[in-house]
Amino acid sequence: EVHRCIRDPGVESKVAIPIDEIKSPSTEFITGRVTNVDVDEQVVELEDDAIEYDYVLLGIGSGTAFFGIDGLEAHAHELKSLDDARAIHAGIEEAAENASRDDPAQVIVGGAGLSGIQTAGEIAEYRDEHNAPLDVTIVEGLDEVFPGNDPELQGALRRRLEALDVEIITGKFISEADEDAVYLGGGEDDPGEELAYDVLIWTGGITGHEEVHGVGVEQDDRSHRINAEADFQTSDERVFAVGDAALVDQGEDAVAPPTAQAAWQAAEVAGENLARAVEGRPLKTWHHDNKGTVVSVGDDAVAHGVKLPGVGTLPINVFGGPAARTLKK
């Protein structure tokens, strides 16, 4: 939900949850940044401390994947935290102040997955609420928004973005970025199509944090996300991994999706398995139960394949309006 803070940082209190409200009284909470996990010495290394462990669960999330695209990391905002959302808000606010109706500021969102769609929607709503001179464009290298999903859902999301006056460019990859523009396509002697921007946001993929690159457990060679079995155990029996820091095996060459819904489900079993490991009991396996997808696009939302307790899968495959907005909340 951090994307909502792009439009209005004042909603932070509805997005951030104080640790004291969720931890048990017996849980010690330490604030610090993990720099490494030494699996041989069984130590979690922090910037200014070190914590010994018997078992450790790695749930540190993911970073933004820039895929080696020249200039992209240096010039684009990312959206992984409240600080990122604040920075995007400040960027579009400043760009709008320096623009005019005749010469609107250009905002480009790279990537039309979940984060990209929701980001573009929030910026479009900001534009409309503040009557701001902003043009919003979303760029996706594959052929449709929300790649790899049901075409009916893709169509509904496209229509909602278009209703918000978001320009959609698909089938063209960003190949380069500098301080003024992104370049689409191109080659060795072809710089590609130039798109000027005032604010650039990149949401085009995830990767494992640098801090886990050197951890001595099996990882995906490209993304450095940690390989974990369906019980969350890694190649080191004392190291578990969960959430989008991990590639959790789901059988038939599938892994759990890097979504909040999956992480929420997984956390219960992962936590129980830590206790089981300590007690020497067999570990439970977990399989993601997809309860459907709800994507917010500005003030509206689009739902797909929703399953409700006691009801099962709803007979309507894709829907929006008040019902979808209620589910999103």
Regions found by a protein language model. Give the residues of each.
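N-terminal Rossmann-like dinucleotide/flavin-binding domain of flavoprotein oxidoreductases
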Residues: 1-55, 66-68, 150-167
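FAD-binding core/adjacent interface of flavoenzyme oxidoreductases
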Residues: 27-105, 110, 201
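A Rossmann-like FAD-binding core segment of flavoenzymes
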Residues: 29-32, 36, 128-225
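FAD-site-proximal beta/loop scaffold in flavoenzymes
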Residues: 74-103, 181, 194-265, 272, ...
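Residues at the starts of beta-strands that form the adenosine-phosphate
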Residues: 106, 133-136, 238
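Glycine-rich Rossmann-fold phosphate-binding loop(s) that bind the pyrophosphate
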Residues: 110-113, 142
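N-terminal Rossmann-fold NAD(P) dinucleotide-binding loop
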Residues: 116
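C-terminal, flexible cofactor-proximal segment of oxidoreductases
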Residues: 266-329
